[in-house]
């Protein structure tokens, strides 16, 4: 619980406003993202209840993680062909400001 509180504080200090995940419902390149959502989304949302985390599915789209910060700044991380564990690490990097 303390780790979740610490990561919430870190995200707030970085000015993180929103996370968006884009993925394809069927493509093999999005499989790790789909697995991440099934296995870890609920835990992530519980750890960050006030952070909007948007999941967007679209046919043939390349899987990406978008982080929107204060003053309209955005960072993009490709999630193509990553495993669920690698997607988790990418998400942790965004939440800690390393992305």
Swiss-Prot record:
A Pfam family: L51_S25_CI-B8
Disulphide bond pairs: 24-58
Keyword Chloroplast annotated: no
Subcellular location: Mitochondrion inner membrane
GO CC terms of this entry: mitochondrial inner membrane; mitochondrion; respiratory chain complex I
UniProt modified residues of type N-acetylalanine: 2
Main location: mitochondrion
Molecular function as annotated in GO: NADH dehydrogenase (ubiquinone) activity
GO biological process: aerobic respiration; blastocyst hatching; proton motive force-driven mitochondrial ATP synthesis
Complex formation: Complex I is composed of 45 different subunits.
Role, per record: Accessory subunit of the mitochondrial membrane respiratory chain NADH dehydrogenase (Complex I), that is believed not to be involved in catalysis. Complex I functions in the transfer of electrons from NADH to the respiratory chain. The immediate electron acceptor for the enzyme is believed to be ubiquinone.
Family membership: Belongs to the complex I NDUFA2 subunit family.
Protein name listed in UniProt: NADH dehydrogenase [ubiquinone] 1 alpha subcomplex subunit 2
Phylogenetic placement of the source organism: Eukaryota, Metazoa, Chordata, Craniata, Vertebrata
UniProt gene name: Ndufa2
């Amino acid at each position: 619980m303390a780790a979740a509180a610490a990561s919430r504080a870190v995200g707030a200090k970085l000015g993180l406003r929103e996370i968006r995940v884009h993925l394809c419902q069927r493509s093999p390149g999005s499989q790790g993202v789909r697995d991440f959502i099934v296995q870890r989304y609920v835990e992530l949302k519980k750890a960050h209840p006030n952070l909007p985390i948007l999941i967007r599915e679209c046919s043939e789209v390349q899987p990406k993680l978008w982080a929107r910060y204060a003053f309209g700044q955005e960072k993009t991380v490709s999630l193509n062909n990553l495993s669920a564990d690698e997607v988790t690490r990418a998400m942790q990097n965004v939440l800690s400001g390393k992305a």
